[in-house]
């Protein structure tokens, strides 16, 4: 879908791309090679730029230490830090996380909670690493590695994503 819309359709219809607030490609890699092959596309460089792609993949320290194979992490991947909106390895503590969406096992309802979801980009891998108190995907180690949080790419940073969508929409409206 990313290829179909961003790379092909927007290339042929720049008038639609110009009206795009942002494309959140969550949990799937966007690479430097993708951007070089499609110069009409821009990756986000901050928290309120518009007409950009926002992408990340979240892993735990074990995947980094083991250099684990992960089906959604491609060579030359780029991620943006959801807590400080930087592309480098500047650490963002969990105190910058506005809240994770988790299941309360007692009520069987989802709720916003602090689970210690910090974030730091690992530039050479193109992922976010977190020390969150969160269960990694299980039963798919051969596909995602032993500590993939592919299942938490949204939920770990849920309120930061909501806040960011509002900021980007406001920036877009202001620019019109």
Go through the PLM ranges and name each one.
Residues 1-4:
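Glycine-rich nucleophile elbow surrounding the catalytic serine of serine-hydrolase chemistry
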Residues 7-157, 162, 166, 171, ...:
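Surface cap/lid and interfacial helix-loop subdomains adjacent to catalytic sites
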């Amino acid at each position: 879908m990313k290829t179909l819309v961003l790379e092909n359709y927007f290339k042929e219809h720049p008038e639609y791309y110009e009206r795009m607030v942002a494309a959140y490609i969550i949990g799937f890699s966007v690479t430097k090679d993708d951007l070089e092959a499609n110069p009409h596309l821009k990756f986000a460089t901050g928290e309120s730029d518009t007409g950009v792609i926002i992408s990340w993949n979240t892993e735990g320290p074990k995947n980094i230490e083991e250099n684990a194979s992960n089906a959604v992490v491609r060579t030359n991947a780029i991620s943006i830090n959801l807590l400080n909106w930087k592309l480098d390895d500047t650490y963002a503590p969990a105190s910058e996380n506005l809240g994770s969406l988790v299941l309360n096992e007692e009520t069987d309802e989802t709720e916003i909670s602090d689970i210690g979801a910090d974030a730091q980009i690992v530039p050479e891998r193109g992922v976010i690493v977190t020390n969150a108190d969160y269960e990694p995907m299980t039963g798919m180690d051969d596909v995602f590695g032993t500590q993939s949080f592919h299942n938490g790419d949204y939920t770990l940073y849920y309120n930061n994503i909501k806040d960011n969508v509002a900021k980007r929409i406001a920036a877009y409206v202001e620019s019109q």
